[in-house]
Regions:
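Pyridoxal 5′-phosphate
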Residues: 1-170
Length: 170
């Protein structure tokens, strides 16, 4: 079987320097050139970090930040800021990604102002999923997507909420 699999591109062999022919023996047949040492060491460091911090602790932190954002977005919805939460309103069964829409306001403009005035990066639009947005009735404008990770802080989450409130009230 190995003899039937031919790489599309080839170059230096890594083990037989005087020829450009791909070796027939393993693992050299599929491992020409220099290994991606920065990638290997980066992966090693990331795995050690995950082991030290713990996936459960990462999940708890992301869940806490997302819950804080959801609570405050629901408060803004009730306040009449013309902001609508996309997807589930509760934390149960959802990840650390939250989409909001702003009927009557261009989501691209809101995302631009979040970046320009507050340094908050979001993803805006259809998120490569136009059919999903048609199902959610957010097509063609899309939504503003926030995502929270382990290295975010409560202060950053509250700044995002405050920024949305200020932008939508002006």
């Amino acid at each position: 079987m190995i003899g039937k699999i031919t790489p599309i591109l080839s170059g230096g062999t890594g083990s037989i320097s005087h020829t450009e022919e791909i070796p027939e023996f393993m693992p050299d047949r599929f491992e020409p050139g220099t290994l991606n040492l920065p990638g290997i060491f980066g992966l090693y460091g990331a795995l050690n970090w995950l082991k030290d911090v713990g996936i459960e602790n990462i999940y708890k932190k992301e869940k806490s930040l997302t819950s804080l954002f959801l609570e405050n977005i629901k408060r803004l919805e009730k306040k009449g800021t013309n902001l609508q939460l996309g997807g589930k309103k509760e934390m149960e069964g959802r990840g650390a990604v939250v989409c909001v829409q702003t009927p009557g306001r261009d989501v691209s403009e809101i995302a631009y102002l979040l970046d320009k005035n507050y340094g908050i990066m979001t993803r805006v639009g259809l998120h490569c999923a136009p059919s999903a947005h048609k199902t959610l009735n957010t097509y063609p404008s899309g939504t503003i997507r926030f995502s929270f990770g382990y290295f975010n802080t409560e202060e950053e989450v509250l700044l995002a909420v405050k920024a949305l409130e200020e932008i939508l009230w002006n």
